[in-house]
């Protein structure tokens, strides 16, 4: 998924907002599948006394999905009214990159939490089964 978001951002930097939207939509679908797998196939197996409760991961998933949707809305609004001047296009690119930064920061923080705790607290067999029947990590 990281590569998909990276590809999206490359389209943003290049000012190709149509391709950026298409790539963002693919990434958002992958994100939804990833969150669904974690919420329904991994978190129910989190042991009592885990470093962080399942509720925390669920709340982070909700926040990530919300930020992703808000970001997509910004891109859609831009596409509905494309900037005409070069300066306006550069300003639009910068605004999207700024918005993406907050989303990427939250995702990175969440991923670190998963690597520090969740990956060590769940049985390997549970993790493998979840991702084999899903889309992969």
Residue ranges and their predicted role:
Residues 1-137:
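Small-residue-biased structural context
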């Amino acid at each position: 998924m990281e590569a998909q978001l990276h590809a999206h951002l490359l389209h943003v930097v290049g000012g190709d907002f149509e391709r950026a939207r298409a790539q963002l939509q693919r990434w958002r679908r992958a994100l939804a599948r990833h969150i669904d797998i974690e919420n329904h196939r991994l978190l129910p197996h989190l042991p009592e006394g885990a470093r962080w409760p399942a509720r925390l991961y669920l709340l982070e998933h909700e926040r990530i999905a919300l930020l992703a949707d808000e970001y997509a809305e910004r891109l859609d609004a831009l596409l509905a009214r494309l900037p005409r001047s070069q300066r306006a296009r550069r300003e639009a690119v910068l605004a999207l990159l700024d918005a993406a930064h907050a989303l990427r920061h939250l995702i990175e923080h969440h991923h670190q939490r998963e690597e520090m705790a969740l990956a060590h607290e769940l049985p390997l067999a549970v993790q493998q089964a979840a991702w084999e029947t899903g889309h992969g990590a």
